[in-house]
Amino acid sequence: MKLLLLALIQFYRRWISPLTPASCRFYPTCSQYGLEAIDRFGPLKGSWLTLCRILRCHPFHPGGYDPVPPLPSCSCGKSPCD
């Protein structure tokens, strides 16, 4: 499922996005955000984060720098988490 979602985003970036004017208000772009979110959090949570990001990408939002959130850190003080 993860690979399918990543492939769909890559297809969009390669074949559809060049046909439309640049309109993403954020950095990284929404498609790059989607790739990173799905890769970092998996298909379910990554897709949810991407959908929320796309819904924020409209002319009435100021946009700006909006990175994918980091993975939760371990509260035990050890790295990596056990």
Swiss-Prot record:
Note the topology in the membrane.
Answer: Peripheral membrane protein
Q: Report the subcellular localization.
A: Cell inner membrane
Primary subcellular site in the record, as a coarse category = membrane
Keywords linked to the UniProt accession: Cell inner membrane, Cell membrane, Membrane
Among InterPro entries, the record links this protein to: Membr_insert_effic_factor_YidD (IPR002696)
Entry superkingdom: Bacteria
The UniProt record lists the keyword Cell inner membrane: yes
Q: Which residues cross the membrane?
A: none
Q: Which GO terms describe its cellular component?
A: plasma membrane
The reply on keyword Cell membrane is yes
The family classification in the record reads: Belongs to the UPF0161 family.
Function, as annotated: Could be involved in insertion of integral membrane proteins into the membrane.
Q: Which NCBIfam families match?
A: membrane protein insertion efficiency factor YidD
Q: What is this protein called?
A: Putative membrane protein insertion efficiency factor
